[in-house]
């Protein structure tokens, strides 16, 4: 029988060893699987972060391109403005030339009129008493005089016609230049409207991408916090559940279950999802984009206590008795000191004191204070206030220095006299 019992004991020991070894192997493989899952999650986070960086790089390139286009459009605008200025200068030059030609034409017309008047005077005043010879001579002389005047008049008319043609051509050129200037102004206004639209589009795109980047950063921050908490929990579990095949008695499943129940769940609380509307409102107010969370280091550093209040807030019965006795001894003396100080204080104005702040004094006899006190009629509105009698002059503090009081008295005496200038 003893041999049978020893054999069964040895078999049971072997079975226990095999079971514990298998359990340790299973736990080891589970920890490896958890590590792999964490690595996969970190890889996915890195990929998402790289994608966000690529998107931001593409956005920055687009912004640079847009800025280059804006610069090109601005240069075009400047060139158009320069062309407009040149054309305006040319138009002004043409106008000056036209004005000069008009002045010349007016001068020529005046000369022609003067010549015509001279000819009429010469024709209207021939001498009647002269002989026919003299008349013929006069006619010959007039012919000789009028022939060059006629040629001069013809030359003047030709010059005037030429000047009129030049003026007409210049006016046509001015009209064409004015039309070109109007076209250029309309083109410049259209370009300016396009620039304004383009700037508005750029600003909207920039604001949208900024909001998206902030949302991605907040999500990445929350995921990093989750990963840190999960890593800490896995490290604790790995410390508690470490594979020890050599000594089976070191590992106790009951302790593991107890510690597993006490461990806080790091990933129980899901973070708040940040929407674009909340993001815009938070940025306009000046708040942070990510939700406020306590750091995992601070949570892990705090000790776990079942009590609701810390040990420093609890008071033992002996301490309570000592405090009660100390308060009973100190309160009456403090009250007497306060009353004494209130007696010595100068009374404040009723506007600065509320009914709750006015100190209550005992009623005094009027024999001592009749000569010093002044009785005033109280209004119905202020009748609810407590009665405050002014203290005597002996109890008042000396608030005015003697020199100042003397100067005030001298000034009051001086007011009665007038100085003659």
Swiss-Prot record:
Quaternary structure and partners: Component of a monopolin-like complex composed of pcs1 and mde4. The complex associates with the kinetochore.
Protein name: Monopolin complex subunit mde4
Subcellular location: Nucleus; Chromosome, Centromere
Organism: Schizosaccharomyces pombe (strain 972 / ATCC 24843)
Predominant location category: nucleus
Pfam families: LRS4 (PF10422)
Taxonomy of the source species: Eukaryota, Fungi, Dikarya, Ascomycota, Taphrinomycotina
Task of the protein: The monopolin-like pcs1/mde4 complex is essential for accurate chromosome segregation during mitosis and meiosis II. May clamp together microtubule binding sites on the same kinetochore, preventing merotelic attachment of microtubules.
Keywords: Cell cycle, Cell division, Centromere, Chromosome, Meiosis, Mitosis, Nucleus
Disordered as annotated region, ranges: 122-158, 224-316
Keyword check for Cell division: yes
């Amino acid at each position: 029988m003893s041999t049978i019992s020893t054999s069964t004991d040895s078999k049971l020991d072997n079975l226990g060893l095999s079971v514990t070894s298998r359990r340790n192997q299973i736990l080891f493989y589970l920890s490896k699987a958890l590590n792999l899952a964490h690595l996969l999650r970190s890889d996915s986070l890195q990929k998402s972060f790289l994608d966000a960086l690529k998107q931001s790089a593409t956005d920055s390139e687009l912004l640079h391109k847009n800025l280059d286009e804006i610069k090109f459009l601005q240069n075009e605008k400047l060139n158009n403005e320069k062309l407009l200025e040149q054309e305006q200068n040319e138009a002004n030059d043409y106008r000056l030339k036209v004005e000069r030609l008009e002045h010349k034409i007016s001068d020529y017309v005046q000369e022609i009129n003067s010549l015509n008047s001279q000819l009429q005077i010469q024709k209207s005043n021939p001498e009647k008493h002269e002989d026919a010879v003299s008349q013929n001579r006069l006619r010959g002389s007039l012919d000789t005089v009028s022939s060059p005047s006629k040629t001069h008049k013809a030359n003047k008319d030709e010059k005037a016609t030429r000047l009129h043609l030049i003026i007409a051509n210049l006016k046509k050129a001015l009209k064409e230049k004015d039309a070109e200037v109007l076209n250029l102004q309309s083109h410049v206004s259209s370009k300016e409207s396009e620039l304004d639209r383009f700037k508005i589009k750029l600003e909207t795109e920039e604001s949208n991408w900024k909001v998206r980047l902030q949302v991605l950063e907040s999500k990445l921050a929350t995921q990093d916090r989750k990963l840190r908490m999960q890593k800490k929990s896995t490290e604790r579990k790995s410390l508690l559940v470490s594979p020890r095949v050599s000594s089976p008695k070191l590992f106790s499943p009951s302790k593991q279950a107890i510690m597993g129940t006490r461990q806080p769940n790091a990933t129980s609380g899901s973070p708040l999802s940040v929407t674009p509307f909340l993001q815009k409102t938070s940025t306009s107010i000046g708040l942070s984009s990510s939700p406020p969370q306590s750091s995992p280091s601070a949570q892990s550093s705090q000790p776990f206590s079942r009590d609701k209040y810390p040990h420093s807030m609890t008071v033992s019965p002996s301490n309570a008795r000592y405090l009660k006795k100390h308060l009973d001894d100190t309160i009456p003396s403090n009250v007497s000191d306060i009353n004494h100080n209130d007696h010595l204080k100068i009374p404040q104005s009723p506007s600065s004191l509320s009914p709750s702040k006015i100190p209550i004094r005992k009623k005094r006899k009027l024999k001592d204070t009749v000569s010093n006190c002044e009785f005033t009629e109280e209004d119905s509105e202020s009748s609810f206030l407590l009665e405050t009698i002014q203290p005597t002059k002996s109890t008042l503090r000396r608030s005015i220095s003697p020199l100042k009081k003397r100067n005030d008295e001298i000034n009051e005496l001086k007011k009665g006299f007038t100085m003659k200038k």
